[in-house]
């Protein structure tokens, strides 16, 4: 979509202009002027793109070509900027005056071409009267349909009986906080249907009632007028002083209102000035539905939230059956063939438990012959035409996103369906693509801003939370299949990305591919063998089992590639030859290799000046490159659990001495690094480091970490692996931000309360000797939620987790994980005061014969 490309161009031009100003000063003032002009013009064009799209959606086909021209212009400008930056960096590096002059002329000529195209676009815009406003007629039609549906007499709910009963009990509870029930969830789950049935069941128990559709662009005056009409306020009072008269009446009435589809909190701030508090003695109630959990949380508090989930398979098929046969119990599957029933179940499975998708699909099938052939054709087309009815509703949520968040949402479509996606990956890929840019004056890191975007997507119920980290952040997430299809369709329509299935075709279209993802080995290899021209490719995702994929990549330069992700899913360890051409990807910012692969990154990788993230999965035995790093932007260097592998497989002495060539101000993750190649004085330079892992920790490193004033003030995660018992006692009490600590020692290590950070949330002790003294220290940690003891030796056979006389023991601990204990035969907790928040006791590995007290037995199941 044009607005996405325009945003990318704006962000890149801001970055380039800033770099020119800092690095070049007055010598390249003319370049900065051109870059600034590009930025201004792209902002101006972006300001009226939404209006142009609204006119096209409203039936004005004349603007279609204009939008296409804008999209092509934005793409060409992005290409120019991506091609421009490496050239200027190269000319600066060698300081060739002639080369600089030649490049300047070339760039100036391209800018002149762009200026002429901008003039033409602006002329056409004025001709079609496209202005900077938002008037999406198609949305208005959809809103009207929703208003009709809101008052339609359809209260049948399938599979939501438990939700209904819980909500009814909550709503009638006299102690309901704020008097609000918030039904939240992704589009299509049946929030409105459930809320309507609930509302209609209880409204007779109140003196007045009303249901209103709030909409995406609400007006408080219209909503209040609607409420006034429904509760019987006289016409004269509505005309004279609506708000005061309405509030006066509601103060003495017990009311219930259903506010459907609330998109943001601003409208509530206006409405609550008129609506009396619901938690008063009168006992009024408000039911809201929203796609955004934060809206419900803001209006009614955390306790008001009730999150709907997709239907289970049998409930889904029950709803499908009701809709297919129009709720006629006399007309059912009795006369259908078993094959037709199976096809029906497969169709329902494709709907992913979303009631809206099931209803739309059933409605379409009712218009067809009830034959296996007809239904099979529908099944084969699932993911495209069948979901069109849902797409309009889902697209509302997409269009409501801030422009900067839209490409972040579309990125989920690059992954296979039902794939669990790490937040770390998403955040750093968004940054690599310049979807997230830190503006001047903003002290927050790009990672923090990207995390805000991810939290917002989850809050809007567009993305499903899978796991949280030790400190409550999002660790991984998923996207529902229905929304995944929306991402793929929108991306294909706008040329944002393409899947393998639609990558083939006109060579001209293939040459314009900017992002592509492969889920199949055969399709991937066939595509590369076709020798496509991929001159504009920015992102390449490969989910494969065939290790030969790397050899096929060797034939391409990928000169504009920003992001490369290779995920190998074969079960065996495979040696791969990573092409030396990887070092020619001058625009590469993000590289992730995952799976059972063994090989070496080419040394030319260190020459990539724009590299920001190298992330090697824990199963991948990939030898790092050697040489002096030239990138001043490297933020994350992650060899996850690489330490155990590298000691036996590779010599890395040629790599780590060059760690000093990294730009210390940007580095945030360094995992793992052998201590023998790591001078403790380097710690003082890593002022923004958040995650650090060191192998074979020496006494000098322990001493440096233990000084009174912390050397790593931003550190949040610390992993230390000792190859021998340290003589120095570690002291981490001066590190307030460390929330996750991993200590791997050789049996003995003197520890006390000063050894640990004060705000520790997750602690892992590996190969540790545990005695009653260290256990007494651990019991006092005020914020510890997860404790893992991995292959530890226990001096006493019995580990008593209860507190002393005051009962103070693990006040916040939620998970205790004991793996392959040595010398432990009994774990007890004999009181209910100790570990009041413990939810889970995990015994894994070799743990035969360990007895548990009754309370712990229940938590270990």
UniProtKB/Swiss-Prot annotation:
Main location: membrane
Membrane topology: Peripheral membrane protein
Record keyword Chaperone present: no
GO cellular component terms attached to this protein's record: plasma membrane
Residue spans of the LRR repeats: 225-248, 305-327, 388-411, 449-472, 510-536, 585-608, 609-631, 652-680, 689-710, 712-735, 736-758, 784-807, 810-835
Residue intervals of the NB-ARC domain: 162-388
Protein residues bound to ATP: 185-192
GO biological process per UniProt: defense response to other organism; defense response to virus; plant-type hypersensitive response
Keywords associated with the record: ATP-binding, Cell membrane, Coiled coil, Host-virus interaction, Hypersensitive response, Leucine-rich repeat, Membrane, Nucleotide-binding, Plant defense, Repeat
SMART domains: AAA (SM00382)
GO molecular function, one term: ATP binding
Alphabetized Pfam families for the sequence: LRR_14, NB-ARC, Rx_N, WH_DRP
Coiled-coil region list: 63-83
Purpose of the protein: Inhibitor of viral mouvements which confers resistance to some tobamoviruses including tomato mosaic virus (ToMV) (e.g. isolate L and W3) and tobacco mosaic virus (TMV), but not to resistance-breaking isolates (e.g. Ltbl) ToMV and tomato brown rugose fruit virus (ToBRFV). Elicits a hypersensitive reaction in response to avirulent (Avr) movement proteins from resistance inducing tobamoviruses (e.g. ToMV and TMV) strains, thus leading to programmed cell death.
Protein family: Belongs to the disease resistance NB-LRR family.
Record text on subunit structure and interactions: (Microbial infection) Interacts with tobamoviruses mouvement protein at the plasma membrane; this interaction triggers defense responses leading to programmed cell death.
Note: The Tm-2, Tm-2(2) and Tm-2nv alleles present in the tomato mosaic virus (ToMV/TMV)-resistant tomato cv. Craigella isolates GCR236 (AC Q71BH0), cv. Craigella GCR267 (AC Q71BG9) and cv. Yukang 2 (AC Q5MLE9), respectively confers resistance to ToMV but not the tm-2 allele present in the ToMV-susceptible tomato cv. Craigella isolate GCR26 (AC Q71BH1).
Name used for this protein in its record: ToMV resistant protein Tm-2 netted virescent
Gene: Tm-2nv
